[in-house]
């Protein structure tokens, strides 16, 4: 029977693989590279140690960032002046600059950025 730490590590690894599939859906080259890097990191920390819970937490945080904060842009390969199209999926975190809080205070925007 596997230990709780091993089960947590497997769960984190699976979440990381799912996050790479979502974040890099149409970019096979980048998705494979990200998965190879995840595998390399998990293999290098195969033995359980003092920092294992921190490593598992790090993997979960990376998966969360990949899933909620990474947006890929594409444009036509032949046209350098083509507009970029962003692939925004349902899990992407959305917000605007007016909702950012600084030191617990709401930021008030008085003028447009181009002014």
Curated annotation (Swiss-Prot):
GO biological process, one term: mitochondrial respiratory chain complex III assembly
Single Gene Ontology MF annotation: protein folding chaperone
Keywords per UniProt: Chaperone, Mitochondrion, Transit peptide
Transit peptide limits: 1-36
Domain of life: Eukaryota
Record-annotated disulphide pairs: none
Function (record text): Assembly factor required for Rieske Fe-S protein RIP1 incorporation into the cytochrome b-c1 (CIII) complex. Functions as a chaperone, binding to this subunit within the mitochondrial matrix and stabilizing it prior to its translocation and insertion into the late CIII dimeric intermediate within the mitochondrial inner membrane. Modulates the mitochondrial matrix zinc pool.
Record text on subunit structure and interactions: Interacts with RIP1.
Protein's UniProt name: Mitochondrial zinc maintenance protein 1, mitochondrial
Source species: Aspergillus niger (strain ATCC MYA-4892 / CBS 513.88 / FGSC A1513)
């Amino acid at each position: 029977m596997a230990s709780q730490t091993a089960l947590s590590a497997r769960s984190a690894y699976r979440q990381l693989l799912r996050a790479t599939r979502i974040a890099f859906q149409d970019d096979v080259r980048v998705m494979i590279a990200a998965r190879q890097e995840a595998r390399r990191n998990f293999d290098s920390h195969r033995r359980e140690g003092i920092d294992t819970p921190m490593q598992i937490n790090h993997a979960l945080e990376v998966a969360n960032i990949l899933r909620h904060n990474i947006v890929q842009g594409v444009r036509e390969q032949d046209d350098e002046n083509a507009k970029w199209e962003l692939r925004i999926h349902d899990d992407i975190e959305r917000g605007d600059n007016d909702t950012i809080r600084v030191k617990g205070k709401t930021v008030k925007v008085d003028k447009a950025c181009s002014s």
